[in-house]
């Protein structure tokens, strides 16, 4: 129930941002443009709902690509698509740069128990996550940090890639299809606890 109210709040923030004087395009400074982001992604970088990703401290190139993909319609989300539609390329680059320089928040997620960690590492080895996300899952450039990301967001994102509901990275879909779904749940829990 809390998640539903948080999502409704985020929708309200998005509508406010997109209405009249509050449009993102009309904002004069980067601080004004990113202020609305806090409604969902959190004032302190901790999202208001577990289904919303951490963007503070995320890779600049990755953030830019996601905003671009929301704007193009290559990545679907009823809240983010209308917001991103108001941005020009320079806005998206500035927003990505702004959030990438914020400190990554500690979500207080527990480390995985040994059995979950072992299952997650088996899945990681079969999928090859570290080939792109690097050894400590910190990401680089256009590849996102996964370590410490919200468990629910990670799990849903993996499922969305697996079912091709998220279609802005076909290579990720192929990798997620190759892994057993239970292993992906363990992987999400493991990554969240790093």
Predicted regions and their residues:
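Inter-heme linker and motif-flanking segments adjacent to c-type heme-binding CXXCH motifs
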Residues: 46-47, 101-112, 116, 136-145, ...
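C-terminal capping alpha-helices of c-type cytochrome domains
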Residues: 85-108, 152, 177-194
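Conserved hydrophobic/aromatic "anchor" residues
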Residues: 70, 98-99, 124, 161, ...
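Short glycine/proline-enriched turn or capping motifs at secondary-structure junctions
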Residues: 5, 165-173, 177-186
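Bacterial N-terminal signal peptides that target proteins for export
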Residues: 1-11, 20
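Sequence/structural segment immediately N-terminal to covalent heme-attachment motifs in c-type
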Residues: 25-46, 107, 111-135, 150
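Gly/Gly-Pro-rich "capping" loops immediately C-terminal to redox-active cysteine motifs
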Residues: 30, 45-76, 81-86, 130, ...
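Cleavable N-terminal signal peptides
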Residues: 12-15, 23-25
